[in-house]
From Swiss-Prot:
Pfam families: EF_TS. Its main location: cytoplasm. SUPFAM superfamilies: Elongation factor Ts (EF-Ts), dimerisation domain, UBA-like. GO terms for molecular function: translation elongation factor activity. It comes from Salmonella typhimurium (strain LT2 / SGSC1412 / ATCC 700720). This is Elongation factor Ts. Keywords: Cytoplasm, Elongation factor, Protein biosynthesis. It is found in: Cytoplasm. Belongs to the EF-Ts family. Signal peptide: none annotated.
Amino acid sequence: MAEITASLVKELRERTGAGMMDCKKALTEANGDIELAIENMRKSGAIKAAKKAGNVAADGVIKTKIDGNVAFILEVNCQTDFVAKDAGFQAFADKVLDAAVAGKITDVEVLKAQFEEERVALVAKIGENINIRRVASLEGDVLGSYQHGARIGVLVAAKGADEELVKQLAMHVAASKPEFVKPEDVSADVVEKEYQVQLDIAMQSGKPKEIAEKMVEGRMKKFTGEVSLTGQPFVMEPSKSVGQLLKEHNADVTGFIRFEVGEGIEKVETDFAAEVAAMSKQS
């Protein structure tokens, strides 16, 4: 067995753009023959996948599944809406979700490691970067899920509610984007940050500090209601809050999770004219 040196791994990385561990594995399998390693990597799609890895994957799908008293939600990203609808991509996402449910896996790194070879092969076949971005689970007495297309997914856990009510609550979460269950759940740092923003606004209006502070107290109550599920107007009956709805049904929401495709990912905006100009200079 030939010695796989650091310099050999470095050379293969520079020539293929693949990761260090992928290069080391390829060299080991090729007994240190770098040309054979490159050929094998081309056949497996590893080189093509490495080249695609730098592309921003901000499109994709959200998948949900309820298994007894535990529900799972998963986001898998690709680069375009076209690939997000591809049967092969959808099947890959379904397979990852099934594995998460079967193994009760909530560590996305575990899923990434488990499906890396299949991901690389799919990248080579489809021609876009693909990323298993995040996975989460929710336990509860009564569980409900809702998907708005494949781009928004919601899980809701409740007590004392029937399945229809939980489904409606999940639809509400999808539409209204609450961040917390109840106003009192809003974290202290979020409250303090908003308080300072509102105080600055009130002070800029020329009000004395004492009056400004009283104004802000009223605004903060409104703010914590707006960002919490129970404080929001129910989307299907805006005349009542979600909290009032739950009280009528003698029910309580114990938790929810909302995923939206690509949230928090910055998409690269391509300047087509600049791209063409750059290409013309190279030719």
